[in-house]
Design a protein with these regions (language model features):
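Interaction-mediating elements
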Residues: 1-127
Length: 127
C-alpha cells in the first residue's frame, strides 16, 4: 500500500522557498491538495506549496519548517527526492543570502555557478 511520506527540511520562509522553486523551473502552486490515487483510501493531504499533483511542501507548525510531502513509492520526478531537496536547499540559500545582502545596502554584481555546482556571489556597496 502506498502512502504519503514527509521529509524534514530546514526551510522556514515561504516567500524564499517559492522564489527558489521558481528559479529551478518547477511548477508551483499554493494551498492545494495532493491526492494519492493508489490504494482504496485515495489519501489526500493539504499543502502550502505544491509542485504538480504528487509533490508538496507543508509547514510543520511545531518546528516552523516546511516539510516535503510525497509518495516515495510512486515518485515520478526524474530527480531523486534527496537530490531534489539538495537543489531546492541550495537555491533557497542563494535567495536568502541575496535578500540579506540587499538589506545591508549591497548589490549583487555577479552570480556564477561553477562546474562543481558551487555558487559564487560577488556583492558591492558604495560608501
Amino acid at each position: 500500500m502506498s502512502h504519503f511520506s514527509t521529509i524534514k527540511t530546514r526551510l522556514r520562509e515561504k516567500d524564499i522557498l517559492l522564489k527558489a522553486l521558481l528559479t529551478l523551473g518547477l511548477p508551483v502552486d499554493v494551498n492545494q491538495e495532493l491526492e494519492n490515487p493508489v490504494g482504496h483510501d485515495h489519501a489526500k493531504v493539504m499543502c502550502d506549496i505544491t509542485l504538480g499533483t504528487d509533490i508538496g511542501f507543508r509547514l510543520n507548525r511545531q518546528t516552523k519548517n516546511y516539510e516535503l510531502v510525497t509518495d516515495l513509492q510512486t515518485w515520478k520526478h526524474p530527480t531523486p527526492p534527496q537530490r531534489m531537496i539538495e537543489k531546492i536547499t541550495q537555491e533557497y540559500a542563494i535567495e536568502l543570502i541575496a535578500r540579506e545582502i540587499k538589506k545591508k545596502g549591497f548589490e549583487i554584481e555577479t552570480q556564477k555557478r561553477n562546474v562543481d555546482n558551487n555558487v559564487e556571489l560577488v556583492a558591492t556597496r558604495w560608501v
